[in-house]
Amino acid sequence: MGAITLDGKATRDEIFVDLKQRVSELNASGRTPGLATILVGEDPGSQAYVRGKHSDCAKVGITSIRRDLPADISTATLNETIDELNANPDCTGYIVQLPLPKHLDENAALERIDPGKDADGLHPTNLGRLVLNTPAPLPCTPRGIVHLLRRYDVPIAGAHVVVIGRGVTVGRPLGLLLTRRSENATVTLCHTGTRDLATLTRQADIIVAAVGVPHMLTADMVRPGAAVVDVGVSRVDGKLTGDVHPDVWEVAGHVSPNPGGVGPLTRAFLLTNVVELAEQR
């Protein structure tokens, strides 16, 4: 018997229904939420991501603001654009689409964002607030993972969660989210230096694969009935491919497809962060 699908698209649609109502209430009170994006260059993947985010905005009634810049812009020009959005009253929250061209400092750009307009939840100040468990915009992908598990009644409290990948956007903040008292999971954070990874994953109730290595998590690494969340994305023969081997579906109890699992929720919680920032004003 195959695993239950952790359907990110259906869950996203549920979130959008709620967001549309909340945006309507904000509009009635004279507060219109606005999401801005800064896109530098013409990377096809980045362009597609940005188009998708603005399409999502239209579905729930959030105002879209775009700042598309040429690939050869100077740091000063990028900084001016960030400062303009920091001061723009129509912009509730915004993101700098990554990756940036190599001559631009991504960390410096992210740090220049007003933490109160950090739609991605990745500003150093807001990551620090996550460590301290104080209110702040939460990183979108980790938040989406937790929501998806809850939506399908996968037990989190007391569960052993093995997270593969220590990146700033997923692995590190996910561990912080899952160990809050509201989640109460025990987290093992694995990476390229982890010895005997399979021994650890076979002990897990929940596995989150977020390394970007195609099909690296195989069926023999998964305990029967475990929940598996596939976050990593690679291109193989021109097609998007996740970190989880197809055979895992025959062993696991729940699996998120990739694409179609966590990705839609990352975008949904980007909008959620913007709506929440508007509600707090």
Curated annotation (Swiss-Prot):
Classification via SUPFAM superfamilies: Aminoacid dehydrogenase-like, N-terminal domain, NAD(P)-binding Rossmann-fold domains
Q: Which UniProt keywords apply?
A: Amino-acid biosynthesis, Histidine biosynthesis, Hydrolase, Methionine biosynthesis, Multifunctional enzyme, NADP, One-carbon metabolism, Oxidoreductase, Purine biosynthesis
Q: MF terms per GO, please?
A: methenyltetrahydrofolate cyclohydrolase activity; methylenetetrahydrofolate dehydrogenase (NADP+) activity
Its EC number is: 1.5.1.5, 3.5.4.9
Signal peptide range: none
Q: In which pathway does it act?
A: One-carbon metabolism; tetrahydrofolate interconversion
> Does Oxidoreductase appear among the keywords?
yes
User: Which parts of the sequence bind NADP(+)?
Assistant: 165-167, 192, 233
The answer to whether UniProt assigns keyword Oxidoreductase to this entry is yes
Q: Which Pfam families does UniProt cross-reference here?
A: THF_DHG_CYH, THF_DHG_CYH_C
Which GO terms are recorded in the biological process aspect for this UniProt protein?
L-histidine biosynthetic process; methionine biosynthetic process; purine nucleotide biosynthetic process; tetrahydrofolate interconversion
Per its UniProt record, what InterPro entries does this chain match?
Answer: Aminoacid_DH-like_N_sf (IPR046346), NAD(P)-bd_dom_sf (IPR036291), THF_DH/CycHdrlase (IPR000672), THF_DH/CycHdrlase_cat_dom (IPR020630), THF_DH/CycHdrlase_NAD-bd_dom (IPR020631)
Q: Name the catalysed reactions.
A: (6R)-5,10-methylene-5,6,7,8-tetrahydrofolate + NADP(+) = (6R)-5,10-methenyltetrahydrofolate + NADPH; (6R)-5,10-methenyltetrahydrofolate + H2O = (6R)-10-formyltetrahydrofolate + H(+)
Which GO CC terms are listed, alphabetically? cytosol
Function, as annotated: Catalyzes the oxidation of 5,10-methylenetetrahydrofolate to 5,10-methenyltetrahydrofolate and then the hydrolysis of 5,10-methenyltetrahydrofolate to 10-formyltetrahydrofolate.
Q: Which family does it belong to?
A: Belongs to the tetrahydrofolate dehydrogenase/cyclohydrolase family.
Subunit field text: Homodimer.
PANTHER family for the chain: C-1-TETRAHYDROFOLATE SYNTHASE, CYTOPLASMIC, C-1-TETRAHYDROFOLATE SYNTHASE, CYTOPLASMIC-RELATED
Protein known as? Bifunctional protein FolD
Organism of this sequence: Mycobacterium ulcerans (strain Agy99)
Q: Which gene encodes it?
A: folD
